Amino acid sequence: MKRSQQFCPKKRKGGYVDMKKKILQTVLFLGIMFLTFYTLLHGQNLSEIYQAVKNMSVPYLIAAAGLALFFVCAEGSMIWYLLTSMRKKTDSQTTVLCVVGKEKVCSLWRCIQYSFIGFFYSGITPSATGGQPVQLYYMNKDGNKGSDSTIVLMTVAVIYKIVLVVLGVGMLLFCGGALKTELQSFFPLYLLGLALNTVVVAVVLAAMLFPQWMIVVWAWVEKQFIRLDIWKANPQRMDKVQTFTGNYRNAVDWLKQHPGKLIVVIAVTFLQRCSVFLLTYMVYLGLGQAGTSIQEVVLLQASVYIAVDMLPLPGAQGITELMYRSVFAPVFSKGSLIPSMLISRGLNFYFLLLAGAGVTAANHFLVKKKI
């Protein structure tokens, strides 16, 4: 069996992703998007909204778009940085060429493409679960070692979650009172989002630091579920858990040997997180707003992001827009609130989603052409 086949669904005619699942995800995504914008725009003066969007300052619009692109490109740069570092240790033993057509693709640009592909599939799947498997597929297809690709993607994902949790906890500790006042009825959702992210980080850290303990706990949980007739006995579940813990353990071993790489990834991830929060402030300035500090706008946007990050909705659509409209109502003037949401959300999600769709389509065409 080829390496790439070990990390992706079995191929079928028309693509490696099951077509029915693909159609269902698309319908769900478009349905939620339609309901979201219908709810938000119903009863609004569309001509005024259009005029406000049209009057957005071009320099600030470019700056906001640049921050959106930086968000995705930063992940690609981390993939490239880690993958290149891991390949250096194997170059003396074997040379692995990653080729699409006749060009090497283990470059910064190729890794940025992986990031756009991951963003697209994460955006159209519930809880952003579809991105990494597809990234892994293309990385393996390019000739990267499956073990290296897995460690790189897991490291990026873990640091992403850890930085998000640290930011969320820091905001709660130092700005808890202000958050509760500003978020009002959405404050419990913020606490839920932070709690869910914390649980994920705790589970992942346990898998990395105490893999045997995790396996024992899982075996006990599985036994209870089988006893209650919730699950049927299936040895493949334990195999998946052992693979899961083994992969994270490999990531830990590699990071222990390269602590400097870990520091770089943490720093870049922090900047990546802040870029998407700062984007909203660029929109705020671009719409001619004043009176609210950059710290407050960034804090509010970060709270929205943390609250919806783990919700099982494609792209966290619907709840993100509704929470934004409520939280930023005191910040933007009445005529600028909806336009600001359309611009900021349009740039940090839909614009990147379209870019990711374009990159994905181009890569899909190239893969089919090679086959």
Language model regions located:
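Membrane-embedded helical hairpins/re-entrant loop segments and their flanking transmembrane helices
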Residues: 74-116, 283-300
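Core segments of transmembrane alpha-helices
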Residues: 163-164, 244, 271-280
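Membrane-interfacial helix-loop connectors
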Residues: 86-90, 284-343
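A short amphipathic helical element positioned immediately N-terminal to and/or at the very start
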Residues: 48-53, 139, 244-256
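Transmembrane helix-loop-helix hairpins in multi-pass inner-membrane proteins
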Residues: 2-3, 9-47, 51, 118-231, ...
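Anchoring transmembrane alpha helix of integral membrane proteins
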Residues: 16-88, 92, 102-105
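Short, membrane-interfacial amphipathic segments enriched in basic
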Residues: 227-248
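Membrane-interface helix starts
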Residues: 55-65, 253-267
